[in-house]
Amino acid sequence: MALDGLSNQTFQEIDVAVVGPAGDQGRQVTEDRGFRYIDDRGSRNRADACNVAIEETESELVFFTDDDVIVPQDWVEKLERWFQRPEVSGVGGPNFAPVDESNIWQKSIDVAFCNKFLTAGTNYGRMSEGTLEEVEQLPGVNSAYRREVLEEVGGFDRGAIGAEDVMLDHRIRLLGHRLWSDGSATMWHRRRGVSRVRKQIRNYGLVRTLAGKRYPRLWGWSHGLVSAFPVLVCFSLATFIWGCLNGGLAWPSFWDISTETVP
């Protein structure tokens, strides 16, 4: 569990807060470890729950992760050190599926999720070039920000049903602040099964489209290409069937590589 890793951090000066429903059994688990449990005030999405956490805490730095991760012991230490630089408003790192706890399907899903060409440019599996690399977006499961910056932008977009980290980072950068990635600060993030991933991808496509409508500058050529993928698949299938019904490519000279036909 995430709480186990947070209980054994090399950086000791941390306050761990878990946000959830008032009657959730997670309260007992959280408090048994000496951590603080915060009522989510009826939040229906991650964005609103994160805003509750920001309002109910006072630390200079705010770290975000999820409940389905394995937190390395030096996670906080690796990210916290960069805030000594004034140009760092937020910093994060890559997230990968834990090798020893993932089946072949989850490993395959991890490869897809960590490839920027298959995810319209996201950097969830991006290994920074050099010690620290400036980026446009931080993974919500592995990120830290200065509180003053979060308060300046007004926190996460209230009511956002997804892509809340994308929109937050976009607004932070619009104000001239800079975000960075430390490729060594890896978070081990458990991947879902195939059936749940299908639903996750469908939902992500929806929320990313909504985010693009709210902030048009978030919509890039890569998102248009991904949106066109179903059309391209249907077109390819139709042309394949048409070719089969019509005897395939009837260009014998095209396929003939004998010396008589090659100039």
Annotated model-derived regions:
Residues 4-13:
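Short, acidic, metal-binding catalytic loop of nucleotide-sugar glycosyltransferases
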Residues 62:
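Short aromatic/hydrophobic "clamp" motif used to bind/position activated sugar donors
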Residues 40-57, 129, 133:
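Glycine-rich, basic loop-to-helix element that forms the pyrophosphate-binding segment
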Residues 74-107, 111:
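Conserved donor NDP-sugar-binding/catalytic core segment of glycosyltransferases
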Residues 66-70:
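The conserved acidic donor/metal-binding loop of glycosyltransferases
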Residues 115, 119-144, 161, 167, ...:
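A recurrent flexible, glycine/aromatic-enriched loop bordering the glycosyltransferase active site
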Residues 229-263:
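Membrane-embedded multi-pass helical conduit in multi-pass membrane proteins
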